[in-house]
Structures are given as C-alpha cells and as structure tokens.
Amino acid sequence: MTTRKDSELEGVTLLGNQGTNYLFDYSPEVLESFPNKHENRDYFVKFNCPEFTSLCPKTGQPDFATIYISYIPDKKMVESKSLKLYLFSFRNHGDFHEDCMNIIMNDLIELMDPRYIEVWGKFTPRGGISIDPYTNYGKPGTKYEKMAEYRMMNHDLYPETIDNR
C-alpha cells in the first residue's frame, strides 16, 4: 500500500524502468524530483555514494571517490535512481575534484531548492595525495544560511586518519 498519489509520482520515470539508458557523459537532465510530504519539519536525507568516478581534465586518468550528499528538503526531494544515473554520468566527464562537487551541489539546488545541502567528496589518492572537497549551501535569509556558515567553519576540525582509504 502506498501513501503517494499518482500525481505525486508523475515526474518519477526512471524508478522501476527496466529499459534504463546509462549515460556516460555529464547529464544533469536525468535528475528527477518528487514532492516532500513532510515539509512541515526539518530532517536530513543522506546519500552515501561509494562508486563515484570522473576523469582528470588534464591527463584523462580516472578519479574515484565516495561522495556524501546530505540535505534538508523543502518542497522537493531528489529521486535516488535518477541521482545514481546522474552521478554515473560523470564517468567520462573531465573536471577537477572541487569542480565536480560544486557542479553536483549546484545541479541539486536547481532541481530541489533545498533548505540546506552539503556535498563532500573523499577521493582516493593519486600521486600520494587524497583530496576531500566540501561544499555547502543554506537558503539565503534563513537559519539555514547561518547553519551553512557554521558547518563550513567546523566541518573537518578533527579529520579521520587516512589509511589509504
């Protein structure tokens, strides 16, 4: 039994679709959303994405990361299969780690207009260095803007011990 009406699921076309088309080039248009039925309260939604890949824009070598996407929804939420396909579309996309995290956050803001969102990429080392870009956003003029500032200043005060991931 579902509590969702068909009208609430009109924009959700990928979930349950057996003929999924896997795109290998950056494709933000694959993202889909659905209505948040609990917009009267704040709550976090967190996605752990351990299989993210993109390409170095200079060398074309593959980069691998676990990405953490956390957000407080407002009126819309991202549909998880569309998010999976969207992240998969970075496979042949050449950009620096920092750029990829900001692109992902910007696309999700455009899709959902969340109250708050953060995207944190933990990339595996290449050349003996791992890069962990973190970006966040709080809706301007709200308490979430202050929350974003606070979390930015305190997000990695006690970093984990790097054990070659």
UniProtKB/Swiss-Prot annotation:
Instruction: Fetch the InterPro entries from UniProt.
Output: GTP-CH-I_C/QueF, NADPH_dep_7-cyano-7-deazaG_red, QueF, QueF_type1
Q: Which positions are catalytic residues?
A: 56 (thioimide intermediate), 63 (proton donor)
Q: Where in the cell is it found?
A: Cytoplasm
Gene Ontology molecular function terms on file = preQ1 synthase activity
Annotated binding of substrate, by residue: 78-80, 97-98
Keyword line: Cytoplasm, NADP, Oxidoreductase, Queuosine biosynthesis
EC main class here is oxidoreductase
Give the EC number.
Answer: 1.7.1.13
What domain of life does the native source organism fall in? Bacteria
**Key word Metal-binding present in the record?**
no
Q: Where are the transmembrane segments?
A: none
Which Pfam families does the UniProt record give?
Answer: QueF
Identify the Gene3D superfamilies for this entry: 3.30.1130.10
Protein task: Catalyzes the NADPH-dependent reduction of 7-cyano-7-deazaguanine (preQ0) to 7-aminomethyl-7-deazaguanine (preQ1).
- What family is this protein classified in? Belongs to the GTP cyclohydrolase I family. QueF type 1 subfamily.
- Output this protein's name: NADPH-dependent 7-cyano-7-deazaguanine reductase
Source organism of this protein record = Bacillus licheniformis (strain ATCC 14580 / DSM 13 / JCM 2505 / CCUG 7422 / NBRC 12200 / NCIMB 9375 / NCTC 10341 / NRRL NRS-1264 / Gibson 46)
Identify the taxonomic lineage of the organism of origin.
Bacteria, Bacillati, Bacillota, Bacilli, Bacillales
